[in-house]
Amino acid sequence: TEYADKWDCIIVDECHRAVTPGIKREIERFFGNSLWYGFTGTPRFAENPYPQMGDLPRTTQELYGDCLHKYTIQNAIHDNAVLGFQVEHNGPKNKKDETDSNLYVTESHMLKVLEVILNKSYYKLGFQNGKGKTYEGLLTTSSIQLAQKYYDLLKMVKEGKTTLKIDEKIKQVLPDFPKFAITYSVTENEEGSHVNQQKMQESLDDYNKMFGTKYEISQIQGYNGNLNKRLARKDAKYKSRNEQLDLVIVVDRLLTGFDAPCLSTIFIDRPPMGPHDLIQAFSRTNRIYDKNKVYGQIVTFQAPKLFKEGVDNAVRLYSAGSTQTALLADWKEVESAFRKSLKALRVSAETPEEVPGMSIKEKKIFVKLFQDFDKFFAQLKSFTQYEDNMLAGYGITEDEYTDYAGQYLNAKEKIKEDTDGQIDDPGVPVVDEDYELMAYSHTKIDYEYIINLIQNIVSPDEESQDVTQEQKQKQMDEVKQYVEELRKDNPKVAEIMTTLIGEIEQDVNKYKGQSILNIVENMKQECIEKVVTDFCITWYTSKDDVMYAAMHYRNGEIPNESAIKETANFTSYKEVQERAIPKFKYYTMMIAELRKTLDEEIKPLMNH
């Protein structure tokens, strides 16, 4: 009461929902003199007001006064604070009445939706990133009953009991896909609350089995909290594929205020929502995450015409009247741009084999054109209607793209090395040196990902400390599986990790609290030291010089070849060799052997 008669400043975050008009009026009556400041990304305008309730205010302006400052979606995208949206509108076309709900409740329709989610979202869900680094999706429906029906249908699909089969391309990356869950308020529908609770307990049982938890219906808040953390993946524990989800089915939960940067896509199988609800739902997908997540993905499955109108209106409303920045081009526009960029690329280099013979100026033009082509190719791949077999019709193959990509990377290196060409030429495009290929599929196992998994075994976070012995063994088996996959590309680093894992299995506390990354890097350095020492003993060369060569070896070039030859001791070499080679052959053979050692023994330990 001591504040009631004073001037009070009240600041409200998420003011579109945090304080209702009725509650605000009650607070104002208590605090006789108050100044209110509201922050919101989705204010209520005259176009989307609060429901009429007597004489209560219906817009954010009526509640808080004139807007003091605007920071729109366009501003945030321009500042690289969030991503733009790629929106696809699916569903029955050319229907007179798109609002006929009977079109969307059949199992046939639902299987078509699941076909898109399970088999047509390879790039939307980040399968090109590889196991453990894929993204997540939300599927939102208009009712709890439909959400439950989708959950049951997904279980049937996974058990092979429907006509819908998961593509081998998907299963090669994630054999256990999809890992899914469901969440809704068990009191949302009082009439069906008993059924909802029973169905939710069945879902909890599935969740418990999947992740080793023990949630009952009475612990629904604990379950929701755990689900939120699992989706957000901000704790080290959830970096492991064993602890991840691919899809969560919701009605309204998680559509506002939930922050999960690794969530890339929202699949909407419900009628068009209002502008405020659309933007809130869309905004779950456009958080900055990694270099391959370049926009938030939205896929709708009902009333395509009405949905497009609704989305365009909502984005205009919250982007100061424009959709240009926030919404990416549709399939037709992207496909046209892709064809044009491919044509331009072919003019620059009809085949990848032409690139090495180009001048630096020509290489710069090629690099810029390939960056444009790669950008449109990545956008094309992200649409659900994209099929790999379409490439033949465009006049290029995935293998040819990979060859172009290889030449592109080599050309970038040559441009960097060209010290004579640093002066800008007005006739040559500026090369974006920081550009990273977007359409390139690289499903190799990531070195740092395995390091993080091992780190969580030896130094678990708080949530991971109570796991059972069975779960610990499951974690270790997962790490071993990844190491074996790494062995295909880098057997030397894989062998070091295998040694480390063996030591951890013998004594899990041996490296507790220590940095696994530092330990592995030290083990790699020890291997490099041994290889260098053995080479120097054999050829009587300077260890410092050979070590320098090992640390700076690039593209087959030994940077200090002359110095190594100068300090090499042929006399000592000859004394210990029973059948020593002539001096004129010694230097040539020694450098050839060094290059082979660097390529086969050192380089794999320097690369991950």
At which residue positions do the language-model features occur?
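A compositional/structural signature marking long, glycine- and acidic/polar-rich segments
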Residues: 1-2, 349
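Catalytic cores of large soluble enzymes that bind and process phosphate-bearing ligands
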Residues: 7, 15-19, 65, 102-109, ...
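Catalytic cores and motor modules of nucleic-acid processing enzymes
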Residues: 122-130, 135, 142, 146-188, ...
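Generic, well-ordered alpha-helical scaffold segments in large soluble proteins
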Residues: 10, 14-18, 26, 30-34, ...
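Signature of the SF2 helicase/ATPase Hel1-core->accessory helical subdomain module
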Residues: 2-100, 110-111, 255-316, 320
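Conserved C-terminal RecA-like helicase domain
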Residues: 101-250
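Generic recognition of flexible, low-complexity loop/linker segments
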Residues: 1, 22-26, 72-73, 120-128, ...
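Non-catalytic, well-ordered alpha-helical scaffold segments
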Residues: 111, 115, 148, 276-279, ...
